[in-house]
Regions:
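RNase H-like two-metal-ion nuclease catalytic core shared by retroviral integrases
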Residues: 88, 101, 121-143
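RNase H-like polynucleotidyl transferase catalytic core
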Residues: 109-111, 115-132, 151
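Active-site-proximal acidic segments at structured loop/helix or strand boundaries
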Residues: 139-194
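Active-site beta-loop-alpha junctions of metal-dependent nucleic acid enzymes
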Residues: 56-81, 103
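Acidic/histidine-rich, metal-coordinating catalytic segments
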Residues: 80-102
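Mobile-element integrase/transposase regions
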Residues: 2-54, 62-69, 115
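Charged helix-capping and loop-helix junction motifs
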Residues: 102-108
C-alpha cells in the first residue's frame, strides 16, 4: 500500500549568526477596545533566525509604508541588518508570487529598500509556510491578547504586545536552549551595521 500523504516536516536547519531574519504578519485580529470599538489589528513579526530574537509591533495597517517603518525600527532594535530577509509572498514585498516553477518578482520599492539596507530578499514558495517556521511557530502566542478583549485602550494594547514580546525574548527558547535577548548580543557582531 502506497502512502499518498505528503510529509511536510522538514529537516531543521540552523542558520549562522547574522545570516537570516524571517518576516511575517499576524493578520486581521478583531479586537474590542475598552471603549467598545472593534478594531482589526495586525502584528508585525520579525525573528532573527540564529538567536530567535523576536521583534513585534502592533499596526492597524499592513501597507508598504508601515512595513518599511517597522523594519527600520526592528533593525535598530536588534542592532543591525541580516544578510537575508525571508518572507512570504505578501503584496507589499512581491509583485509576482514565488512558486515551485517561478522565482517570483520582488516589488521595485521593496527591492530598493533591501538594496539600501544591504539585505537579500528571499521569498518562500507560495503555499509552503513551514519554510519560514521560525516566525510562523510563535504566531499562536498572540492569541493571548484575546484575554484582554474589551479591557484595554489602543496604547495599553500596544504596551501589552511589547510586554509579551519582552517576556518571550527573556525566556529560554525550547529549540536552541538559550535566551534570545542574551543571544542577540552575540549575533549583533555579525549583522550589517545600520
Amino acid at each position: 500500500i502506497r502512502n499518498n500523504m505528503t510529509n511536510h516536516r522538514s529537516i531543521k536547519r540552523e542558520t549562522g549568526m547574522g545570516v537570516e531574519a524571517q518576516l511575517d504578519w499576524k493578520e486581521n485580529m478583531h479586537y474590542t477596545l475598552n471603549t467598545g470599538e472593534v478594531i482589526e489589528l495586525n502584528i508585525f513579526a520579525l525573528v532573527y533566525s540564529y538567536s530567535r530574537y523576536r521583534i513585534n509591533f502592533i499596526s492597524l495597517t499592513k501597507k508598504q509604508g508601515a512595513l518599511f517603518h517597522y523594519l527600520d525600527q526592528a533593525f535598530e532594535a536588534a542592532g543591525g541588518v541580516p544578510d537575508i530577509l525571508k518572507t512570504d509572498n505578501m503584496k507589499t514585498v512581491m509583485d509576482e508570487a514565488r512558486t515551485e516553477y517561478s522565482s517570483g518578482k520582488v516589488n521595485a520599492k521593496f527591492q530598493q529598500f533591501a538594496n539600501d539596507y544591504g539585505f537579500v530578499v528571499k521569498p518562500c514558495i507560495a503555499g509552503k509556510p513551514w519554510s519560514k517556521g521560525k516566525v510562523e511557530a510563535p504566531m499562536k502566542l498572540w492569541d493571548e491578547l484575546y484575554a484582554y478583549n474589551g479591557k484595554l485602550n489602543y496604547a495599553q494594547l500596544n504596551e501589552k504586545v511589547m510586554e509579551i514580546n519582552e517576556r518571550n525574548n527573556c525566556q529560554v527558547h525550547s529549540e536552541i536552549g538559550k535566551i534570545p535577548k542574551l543571544h542577540i548580543q552575540k549575533e549583533k557582531d555579525f549583522l550589517s551595521p545600520l
